Regions:
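Active-site-adjacent loop/helix segments that line or gate small-molecule/cofactor pockets in enzymes
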Residues: 404-412
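Short beta-strand-initiation
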Residues: 80-81, 415, 425-426
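Single, functionally critical "micro-switch" positions that shape active/binding sites
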Residues: 88-89, 435, 439
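Short, basic/aromatic recognition patches
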Residues: 412-420
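Active-site lining segments that contact anionic ligands and/or coordinate catalytic metals
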Residues: 425-428, 485
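Conserved helicase core region in the C-terminal RecA-like lobe
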Residues: 428-435, 442
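Short glycine/proline-enriched turns and hinge-like loops at secondary-structure junctions
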Residues: 422, 439-443
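N-terminal non-catalytic structural scaffold regions of very large proteins
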Residues: 1-233, 237-397, 407, 421, ...
């Protein structure tokens, strides 16, 4: 609103000058029943405002999106400004990229006592938890926070319905060697007298340990266990879809069944207490533990960049918005209960008048302004997620957009997470990192790195089955252990098995190059497993495809690119260039220059200097410098005097 009482659209530069937040209103359509009357508010006139969402500059809903240089100048914006930041109370704020260990993936590592351990961080829209399978004294144990102690693996498998010892051995891998390794674990279950599924559930019921009053997204607390032993579970787990309704008092076996269905390995679906998919997953984890005991080379490296995911501003704001929206609903429910309980109401009660628009607005603003991200449901409590955009120079602002923040403690003097990994080649800048305690923990993206977003899984699932993947319910353990067969994983979920994994991966890649699949879908086969990934947060980069020793991109293509008759997206659509993530790079042979291309080469680098970031890329002849000198210049180059932006004097 101007001085003359006229209104006009808000621009980012207005927000900078007036110390206000650049945000867009969130409108919803509302439909609810009042007595026997259906109240509907929708459309442009009837929609209801529930809050305001801070907008990222140059995003699709920003007024600057798609604007020409002339329009940007009229709006007081610099045409070279990259965007990608928020304006909160007049201050420019950047949400730093957050580095996380990948979810729903099996990671093999040594635990604190030196034992081989397979761990999975299960993450769903409801909860996040970690499950471990550990080898200790020749036996396998499952460990989870909801179970009091380490539980013998065979008891867990029996509770899931795998009662027969022969079935367990065949699912883990078959063969006399596997039977010999599993014998102590099977014997341990027999010693405690667990032979049937019901006995296993009763035994596990005494070990269930869930907090009392765990409501909302956690397991249902409507049926507390009898107060007999203190180790008994205090709350029941959330039953999967199609499960029988909860009773007032529940047996320990029911609690154990619900915990196995909805809490342990929560990302593996269980429908109507059919545990077959979860049994296969647990057995796959056990098989990897046994294989790693025999061959330590099969252990995973936690610092390997294929096991990392990057969280961007959209995911972080989405988590926060979901939490605030649930809080708004809870406040609205309480306000409606209070209003309807009044005996002296004069007119019809309108619940929409109780909606508070400041709950979501203030929650998002406070998080962006302070940098404190708190989501209780996922036990997330992070500090310093946002920082004030550095405007020392144009290059310092640009470099801050590509900064990656690790969750590792800066004070710990550990070299592993700080070291430069070979898997970071082409994905992260090898030079641009701060000196001192944050060295190696704060990193920067390389010039051509792309961070993926989530893609729909269902088309990939159908395609995998069409290309010969056999569904899990149709397979026995002997078929899974057949020579050459491989389990097919889609984003951490077991789809089934394929008899020719290398051929399956090649067909998927051919479809991706033909444009039938998303360009960021990744597929790679390794040691009896084939992984398809379409989840968000993976780092990938473009490479030129090489066929029979000849690069697909020719001089004619480059001339068309210079003449602007072809764009970069055309190279992707025509199958000349493709994006590879870190895992798929392991299946490729990449040449640095055309002179290095041989018959076995699969890809060619677009340009070797693209391994550097946006700041290190400005250093002249960096390969003639001692490496610490490049790191020092990355810090000092951001402090150079120069024009910050074209609009710095407005």
């Amino acid at each position: 609103v101007e001085e003359d009482a006229c209104t006009r659209p808000l621009t980012p530069h207005d927000c900078r000058l007036r110390d206000c937040t650049y945000a867009a209103p969130i409108y919803v359509d509302v439909e609810y029943t009042r007595g026997k009357e259906l109240v509907v508010r929708r459309g442009h006139s009837g929609r209801v405002l529930i809050g305001r969402l801070p907008l990222m500059l140059r995003s699709s809903h920003c007024v600057l999106a798609g604007a020409s240089e002339e329009q940007l100048a009229r709006l007081g914006e610099c045409p070279l400004d990259p965007g990608g930041y928020f304006i909160v109370k007049g201050t420019e704020k950047v949400v730093l990229i957050q580095e996380q260990l990948s979810k729903n993936r099996i990671i093999l590592d040594l635990d604190a006592k030196g034992a081989v351990c397979a761990s999975v961080t299960s993450s769903t829209h409801e909860r996040k938890s970690k499950t471990h399978i550990t080898a200790r004294a020749g036996r396998l144990y499952l460990r989870h926070n909801s179970l009091g102690d380490d539980v013998p693996l065979c008891i867990v498998l029996r509770a899931m319905g795998a009662v027969c010892d022969q079935e367990i051995v065949s699912l883990v891998g078959g063969g006399a060697n596997v039977a010999h390794l599993l014998a102590p674990s099977i014997q341990e279950a027999a010693v405690v007298g667990v032979h049937t599924q019901q006995q296993a559930l009763d035994w596990l019921g005494a070990k269930v340990r869930l907090p009392r009053g765990n409501s909302g997204s956690g397991p249902s607390s409507s049926g507390a266990a009898p107060p007999a032993p203190p180790a008994a579970g205090a709350a029941a787990g959330a039953a999967p879809a199609g499960a029988p309704p909860t009773r007032a008092r529940r047996s320990r076996a029911d609690e154990a069944r619900d915990v196995l269905a909805g809490v342990v390995l929560a990302h593996v679906p269980v429908d109507r207490y059919d545990f077959s998919a979860k049994v296969q997953y647990v057995c796959a984890m056990a098989a990897r533990v046994l294989a790693a005991q025999a061959d330590p080379a099969q252990l995973d490296d936690k610092d390997y960049y294929g096991n990392k995911r990057l969280e961007l501003a959209g995911q972080l704001l989405g988590l926060l918005f979901e939490d605030l929206f649930k809080r708004l609903n809870a406040e609205l429910r309480r306000a409606a209960d209070t209003g309807l309980s009044r005996a002296n109401r004069a007119g019809a009660f309108d619940v929409l008048k109780c909606i508070r628009t400041d709950t979501i607005t203030n929650g998002l603003e406070h998080a962006l302004a302070s940098g404190n991200w708190t989501v209780k449901r996922f036990r997330m409590d992070r500090k310093g997620v946002t920082q004030v955009l550095s405007r020392l120079s144009f290059i310092s602002a640009l470099g801050m957009m590509t900064r990656i923040n690790s969750q590792f403690e800066k004070t710990r003097k550990v070299s592993g997470p700080r070291a430069l990994q070979p898997s970071q080649w082409g994905m992260l800048c090898p030079s641009d990192t701060p000196e001192g305690e944050a060295c190696g923990l704060v990193k920067n993206l390389a010039l051509m790195t792309h961070v993926t977003t989530d893609e729909e899984e269902e088309p990939l699932r159908r395609l995998a089955f069409a290309l010969g993947t056999e569904p899990l319910p149709l397979l026995a353990g002997a078929q899974l252990g057949a020579t050459g067969a491989a389990l097919v994983f889609l984003n951490g979920h077991v789809l089934g098995a394929h008899r020719w994994p290398a051929r399956f991966a090649e067909r998927l890649r051919a479809l991706r190059r033909a444009g039938r699949l998303g360009e960021f879908v990744s597929v790679h086969a390794v040691a009896g497993r084939c992984y398809i990934a379409s989840d968000g947060g993976r780092v990938c980069r473009p490479l030129i495809i090489v066929r029979d020793g000849t690069p697909a991109v020719t001089d004619a293509h480059l001339a068309a690119l210079r003449a602007k008759t072809l764009a970069f997206v055309d190279f992707i659509e025509r199958g000349l260039v493709e994006y590879l993530d870190v895992n798929e790079e392991n299946d490729s042979l990449i040449a640095l220059t055309p002179a290095h291309v041989t018959r076995s080469t699969t890809h060619l680098e677009i340009e070797p200097f693209t391994i550097l970031g946006v700041v290190a890329g400005l250093i002249p002849y960096p390969h003639h410098n001692q490496s610490p000198r490049n790191t020092y210049q990355c810090a000092m180059g951001k402090q150079a005097m120069g024009a910050v932006a074209f609009n710095q004097n407005i």
